[in-house]
Amino acid sequence: QQTESRFIFKNIITPEDKFTFTICNPPFHSSQDEATKSTVRKINNLESRSAGSKVIKPILNFGGHNAELWCEGGELGFVTQMIYESAKYPMQCLWFTTLVSKKENLSSLYKTLSKVNAVEIKTIDMAQGQKTSRIVAWTFLSEAQQKAWKF
């Protein structure tokens, strides 16, 4: 468990650790207010499709506790920090991966991955119903190092 909330991998990945991959479902929102408005919008959309009524106060949080739904900087800030931290463990993890909900964040994330010298970057698009998101994966290992990877 992370003991310092401002970090993602520090104190979690130790010098003797080796991981085939990490996976992250980052906080999407940058504030409690933004998370609440998003929840209200989702509930209203669901209600308008089924019963035609409007819900004013959110009852559900759509799959997370408050601390999991938002953080300062939102999805872009969280994943950017994750990328910078991942660069401190280049030989300890074959692939770092994260969900990216907001397509407009991709350009900035790709620039950050370039800054930290990620060797390979992959984006996997996903769609379910009207929701489109993607998984972004990166590695600091060369093709030869990837093939030689042993867990």
Enumerate the language-model features and the residues they cover.
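Glycine-rich, charged/polar anion/phosphate-binding loops
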Residues: 5-10, 82, 122-123
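Class I S-adenosyl-L-methionine
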Residues: 102-151
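Mobile active-site "lid"/loop adjacent to the S-adenosyl-L-methionine
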Residues: 20, 26-77
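Conserved nucleotide-binding/hydrolysis micro-motifs of P-loop NTPases
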Residues: 5-6, 27-30, 103, 142-144
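S-adenosyl-L-methionine
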Residues: 1-24, 31-32
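Conserved Class I SAM-dependent methyltransferase catalytic core
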Residues: 58-122
